[in-house]
């Protein structure tokens, strides 16, 4: 039995400045504190996250977040066993702010420093919340990423497929912007879609006619733009019903694509022969109600357990980073002062790059 470990986690990969303290005793884990300082108001006027503004805000807020996390946990630095920090992938300015703070704390205290892949934090969250056993199938679906992974260990992931262009969260945000809805786009589009007719617009279901688990959402976004422009040209603007129907049609298309691709991923995962087969979902888009409902139905039909973290742990947070740091530390992972911030960091380094990875390679 491994000894109890208490880790501080630091997260600053996008537009949430976060710190948390997690204690693990064997397979049991307890979140002693979790502080998240969002930046939505700072970026609202720009319709999206501005990297320079985000980086400056992280630099200003990280110290205070760490202080609050320790205070709420009732602990000091001397009570910790290690420091975990998101080292990528993400917006490099923010990631660098977090890494530099973590290095300073580790150097000043002598505590172990563990760099964590942000996506591993999401992917390992079901083990933090439910003690899920390896191997399990993970659908990581967020603002910047969308991929199916078989999680076999704290640092062992096999990618089955993913989005070759826009991630669903990015598509939700852009849809909200096109329709004049507030950011973040996911909750806004979901709320608007609740009163809409998903059958009014014949939006495409990209890549369902192709085998495999890869996805595409940029064409769906373009189809919505054309439908919006057609309505504006015809009527001179959008009614509330138009906006609701556009959101409902867009959301229904995303749900159908994710559900069908999940069925295919489960078929591949079945070959793992897991004693307790499970499908888990994580990432900000996992907070979407219709997506959760569809994935629950797919899992039930396949006879596998379905897990989704509490909504507060679906979006970016530092508790998942602290936990992933503990998992990696237990497996022998540890970093020194040479730890660097990485804008791109694929979880499955052996998988071929997705079509839309670009010349610099896959982000994740």
UniProtKB/Swiss-Prot annotation:
Gene3D superfamilies for this protein: 3.30.420.40
A GO biological-process term: tRNA threonylcarbamoyladenosine modification
UniProt-listed InterPro entries: ATPase_NBD, Gcp-like_dom, KAE1/TsaD, TsaD
Subcellular location: Cytoplasm
Sorted UniProt keywords: Acyltransferase, Cytoplasm, Iron, Metal-binding, Transferase, tRNA processing
Annotated function: Required for the formation of a threonylcarbamoyl group on adenosine at position 37 (t(6)A37) in tRNAs that read codons beginning with adenine. Is involved in the transfer of the threonylcarbamoyl moiety of threonylcarbamoyl-AMP (TC-AMP) to the N6 group of A37, together with TsaE and TsaB. TsaD likely plays a direct catalytic role in this reaction.
NCBIfam families: gcp_kae1, T6A_TsaD_YgjD
UniProt protein name: tRNA N6-adenosine threonylcarbamoyltransferase
Organism: Cereibacter sphaeroides (strain KD131 / KCTC 12085) (Rhodobacter sphaeroides)
Gene: tsaD
